[in-house]
Amino acid sequence: MGKLLKPSKEIGIVGYGAYVPMYRIRNEEIGRVWGVSNFPIEEKAVPGLDEDAVTIGIEAARNALKRAKIDPREIRAIWFGSESKPYAVKPSATIIAEAIGATPDLEAADFEFACKAGTEALQAAIGFVASGMAKYAMAIGADTAQGRPADHLEFTAGAGGAAFIVGEKSSETLAYFEGSYSYVTDTPDFWRRQHEHYPRHGNRFTGEPAYFHHVITAAKTLMDELGLTPADFDYAVFHQPNVKFPLTAAKILGIPKEKVLPGLLTGKIGNTYSGATMVGISAVLDIAKPGDRILWVSFGSGAGSDAFSIVVQDAIEEKRDLAPKVEDYVKRRKVIDYALYAKARRKYIL
């Protein structure tokens, strides 16, 4: 048996949608407060006082439904991936399902795997639909990531998310999955223990042993199993904790940065964790042409990567304009100072 994950039925994306909060804080403003002058990105998205990972997931799910043009009650599973769920004990997926009118006849659960929780949910959704147990399933990745004040994560931890509705490949699917591959090991590069507010990171594990080892291995294995080369892909979206890592991964794989930049959004909205590659793929689908092939590789600390190859179909031309595009959310911005940012992120202890 090969390593490729390929269901017996061809599965495609029926609808997709993204959402990014309006507020932004520039890295130079964070640096002004903490006396730092070297910045990994330009600015990051900040959730409003009435926003969290669930509200982001709801907005993304609604946009996906607009493009899918289906009755939400036809969705038989909603799986929500996040590491910043508002409840420690209570599923967020049920809130989203209720909000979009999908209840009560469906599966609903929350997934966790650091920044690849959303693509982990997507793998499950693909298998669930391919098994014949559901006509449609929805996978969501959304986060309002936190970084300890003055920690380097504070400069990049952003907010945003995306949702994908999958179904059997047809003339109504806007892209289909050629295959996927998942690769995981026990690598302690990043964690947050119970009752701790901010995550910790093992610096010596962060780069080569964690991100690059898993992303490169997953991408190469997927291409080898499908008999494809980097030249066969028109776009590539990698997990983007910063701007440097995905561009370096692309260079190692022999993929020109021009194929990566359209889906590389961290510099403008920060690292959206579970939403990172899903928002990036949404941005690429907003501009892709029928026949384009896209390499999609997520990464989650702890550690693992999911790699997908998707091919864009004709329906993209009709569906992409049915909901706001990622660029619309990127341009919809209001810059705030550190005081308002700290208030919005509840960093003040009263």
Swiss-Prot record:
> GO biological process annotations for this chain's record?
farnesyl diphosphate biosynthetic process, mevalonate pathway; isopentenyl diphosphate biosynthetic process, mevalonate pathway
| Positions that bind CoA | R204, K244
- The active-site annotation reads E83, C115, H239
A Pfam match: ACP_syn_III_C
Q: Give the Gene Ontology MF terms in alphabetical order.
A: acetyl-CoA C-acetyltransferase activity; hydroxymethylglutaryl-CoA synthase activity
Q: What is its EC number?
A: 2.3.3.10
Known catalytic reactions:
acetoacetyl-CoA + acetyl-CoA + H2O = (3S)-3-hydroxy-3-methylglutaryl-CoA + CoA + H(+)
Which of UniProt's keywords are assigned here?
Acyltransferase, Isoprene biosynthesis, Transferase
The protein's role, per its UniProt record: Catalyzes the condensation of acetyl-CoA with acetoacetyl-CoA to form 3-hydroxy-3-methylglutaryl-CoA (HMG-CoA). Functions in the mevalonate (MVA) pathway leading to isopentenyl diphosphate (IPP), a key precursor for the biosynthesis of isoprenoid compounds that are building blocks of archaeal membrane lipids.
Q: Which HAMAP family match?
A: HMG_CoA_synth_arch
Task: Identify its protein family.
Answer: Belongs to the thiolase-like superfamily. Archaeal HMG-CoA synthase family.
Protein name, UniProt field: Hydroxymethylglutaryl-CoA synthase
In which organism is this protein found? Pyrococcus abyssi (strain GE5 / Orsay)
Q: What is the lineage of its organism?
A: Archaea, Methanobacteriati, Methanobacteriota, Thermococci, Thermococcales
